[in-house]
Amino acid sequence: DKSDVLIELAQKHAKENQLTIEYLASDAESLIKRQSQSFDIVCCMELLEHVPDPSSLIQACSALAKPGAWVFFSSINRNPRAYLLAIIGAEYLLKLLPRGTHDYKKFIRPSELASSARLAGLTLKQLQGIHYHPLTQNYALTEDISVNYLAALQKRS
């Protein structure tokens, strides 16, 4: 992560749970210079819809992964239902997120992610929806990818 504050929170969580995890305050492009094609798993969660060039970030994540490695992305689909739930619902009605957190135009359809991933040497293996239950504050995997979704891709050898 690029945020020192979030790195500190993650380190605190790891220490409290007696986990041995190395956290780095870095962006993907800087990390490529030091550790290109060195990771078995690369996760990029809830970030693609916030960057100016998602295809560039997908390419960077692929560059960090070893051949045969897994790369995971989560994002928000771009359609009216996603707008209603992720922006109107989460930001304005339920106030789960600050207003303006999301820009509908930056939401990414799974087909767009898959297309950019193919160009980056990644093959889409599985796509799952993620559903948030506001009353129980729990998440569940679902077949419905109309709002939040998780993509599992594998780097070609």
Give the predicted meaning of each segment.
Residues S75, Y92-E112:
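Acceptor-substrate binding/catalytic loop of class I
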Residues E29-V42:
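A short acidic, Gly/Pro-enriched loop at the edge of an enzyme's catalytic core
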Residues W70-L94:
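Conserved class I S-adenosyl-L-methionine
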Residues Y104-L127:
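Short alpha-helix
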Residues I41-D53:
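A short SAM/SAH-binding and catalytic strip from SAM-dependent methyltransferases
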Residues S55-W70:
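A short glycine-rich, Lys/Arg-flanked "PGG" loop and its adjoining helix->strand segment in the class I
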Residues Q137-S157:
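Core SAM-dependent methyltransferase catalytic element
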Residues D1-L31:
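Class I SAM-dependent methyltransferase SAM/SAH-binding core
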